[in-house]
């Protein structure tokens, strides 16, 4: 008669193997507690790793997207939600989407390139070129972001004098433009601090956008639909983009807040590069009275 195959013994959890290796042999109850502890720790760790690639959580401190998203500087009443980082791997952002992206809030110099124009005019490490509150000025134009700074340099004709006034109020004459297309070409090196913003995507690369009489026009056609039923402000003298017909460069996006009168957005600082797109809000978790799919 064939002997029944013996059931293979279950291997103990790794944590039990470790403690036994060091001479501790816990009883049944403690062993079960240690096994469950290992399961929970591994599950939480894997979830954290997966979530870091799939989603991120965001709190909103301002009312720039009100009433779609509520903000509060104290964060006690501010909307808090999870952001889907996967969707835009399968489709491109499109006008009307609510988009989370990284935005420059401080551009600060590192030591300039040795022998460069930046070193010769005395630019030193640690100076704020621009912040989200105070722009730099290039060719008389207020610029808040790396994109806007380099766009301005690239747009100037050869022979143009390059004068930089930083957020700290210092003015530097970097000479005349020859073949330079970025401020870094003059020997300025910087580090950029970014934070997450949430706005509504209005126009994509290749489209022309204009705000007129409270409405938005894309390639001459007025945007219609519930997502665009807001009164868009265009009368502030500080606005530089979208007031006249403005072409959005390929690979960039033009973003506005739904609460146009209280939004620091693309009208001030221009365009968001594709590399700075984070994802789409999908689940509001705070406050509990507004919990749900966005």
Predicted regions and their residues:
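Soluble "head" domains of membrane/secretory-pathway proteins
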Residues: 2-41, 49, 53-59, 67-111, ...
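A short acidic/basic microdomain associated with nuclease active sites
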Residues: 62
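Glycine-rich repeat segments that build the extracellular carbohydrate-interaction surface of secreted
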Residues: 82, 164-165
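Acyl-donor binding region in acyl/amide transferases
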Residues: 115
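Exposed beta-strand face motif in extracellular beta-rich ectodomains
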Residues: 160-162
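Glycine-centered tight beta-turn/hairpin loop motif at sheet-sheet or coil-to-beta transitions
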Residues: 167-169
């Amino acid at each position: 008669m064939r002997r029944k195959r013996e059931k293979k013994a279950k291997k103990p959890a790794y944590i039990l193997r470790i403690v036994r290796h060091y001479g501790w042999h816990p009883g049944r109850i403690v062993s079960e507690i240690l096994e469950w502890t290992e399961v929970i720790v591994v599950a939480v760790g894997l979830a954290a790793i997966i979530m870091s690639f799939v989603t991120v959580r965001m709190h909103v401190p301002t009312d720039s997207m009100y009433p779609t998203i509520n903000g509060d500087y104290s964060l006690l009443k501010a909307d808090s939600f999870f952001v889907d980082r996967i969707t835009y791997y399968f489709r491109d952002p499109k006008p009307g989407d609510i988009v989370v992206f990284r935005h420059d809030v401080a551009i600060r110099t590192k030591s300039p390139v040795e022998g460069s124009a930046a070193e010769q005019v005395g630019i030193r490490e640690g100076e704020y070129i621009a912040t989200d509150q105070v722009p730099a000025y290039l060719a008389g134009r207020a610029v808040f972001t790396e994109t806007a700074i380099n766009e301005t340099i690239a747009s100037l004709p050869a022979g143009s004098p390059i004068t930089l006034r930083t957020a700290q109020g210092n003015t530097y004459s970097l000479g005349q433009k020859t073949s330079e297309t970025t401020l870094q070409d003059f020997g300025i090196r910087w580090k950029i601090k970014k934070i997450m913003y949430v706005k509504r995507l209005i126009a994509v690369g290749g489209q022309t956008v204009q705000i007129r009489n409270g409405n938005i026009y894309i390639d001459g056609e007025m945007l219609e639909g519930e997502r665009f039923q807001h009164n868009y402000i265009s009368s502030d003298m500080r606005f530089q983009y979208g007031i006249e017909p403005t072409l959005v460069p390929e690979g960039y996006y033009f973003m506005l807040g739904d609460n146009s009168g209280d939004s620091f957005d693309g009208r001030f600082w221009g365009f968001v590069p594709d590399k700075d797109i984070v994802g789409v809000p999908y689940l509001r978790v705070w406050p509990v009275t507004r919990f749900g799919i966005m």
